Design a protein with these regions (language model features):
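Glycine-rich, flexible loop segments associated with nucleotide phosphate handling
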Residues: 17-24, 61, 81-86, 135-136
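Acidic-leaning, charged glycine-interspersed low-complexity segments
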Residues: 42, 84-151, 159
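Small/polar-rich, solvent-exposed N-terminal microdomains that initiate assembly or binding
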Residues: 1-55, 158-159
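Generic secondary-structure microfeatures
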Residues: 45-50, 67-73, 94
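Extracellular/virion structural assembly segments
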Residues: 56-62, 71-98
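Short, solvent-exposed beta-strand/turn "edge" segments of beta-rich domains on protein surfaces
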Residues: 35-36, 52-60, 129-135
Length: 159
């Protein structure tokens, strides 16, 4: 999404409109009072973690991630379209890749998290209806399978 350039709200002292790609934050904005100054942005927030194990099958841990999208545009139609475009481009990229991860200690890329799409775990996308113009926001809920934790030994947690 680095190539998606959107307008930034003009601040006191600005003489011309600035543009940039959405910034990405984990869990929350660094300064929640500056939410309007930070637009456009995406915040990824981890919400409930759920581990289950069906008899005779592997343990499965799924985490939900709420991605909150925000953009600015002085034109109402352009603002709504910019938000929908930002959310749709993100959704399409997720569906193309379906796996995310990091770099291991050996320098190789590791796919640690797999997108889960099933009747109980849908990819949901909702633009907010509130009248917040010239700011536009929405959210997407995704579910991710975490790596299985291999039990290596029996330990007593409470002695």
């Amino acid at each position: 999404m680095a190539d998606m350039i959107l307008p930034v709200a003009m601040q006191q002292g600005d003489t011309e409109q600035a543009y940039r790609a959405p910034e990405v934050y984990l869990m929350r904005l660094p300064d929640s009072r500056s939410a309007k100054k930070k637009a456009p942005y995406i915040i990824h927030r981890v919400i409930p973690l759920e581990t289950e194990q069906q008899p005779g099958s592997e343990e499965r841990t799924v985490v939900s991630v709420r991605s909150i999208f925000c953009c600015y545009n002085p034109d109402e139609q352009e603002g709504d379209l910019a938000l929908l475009t930002m959310m749709e481009r993100f959704r399409v990229e997720l569906l193309k890749v379906r796996k995310v991860g990091g770099t291991g200690t050996d320098g190789k890329h590791r796919y640690q998290f797999t997108l889960v799409l099933s009747p109980g775990h849908k990819l949901e996308s909702v633009p907010y209806d509130e009248e917040t113009k010239p700011y536009y926001a929405g959210e997407m809920i995704t579910n991710w399978k975490l790596p299985t934790v291999q039990q290596t030994e029996d330990i007593k947690l409470w002695r």
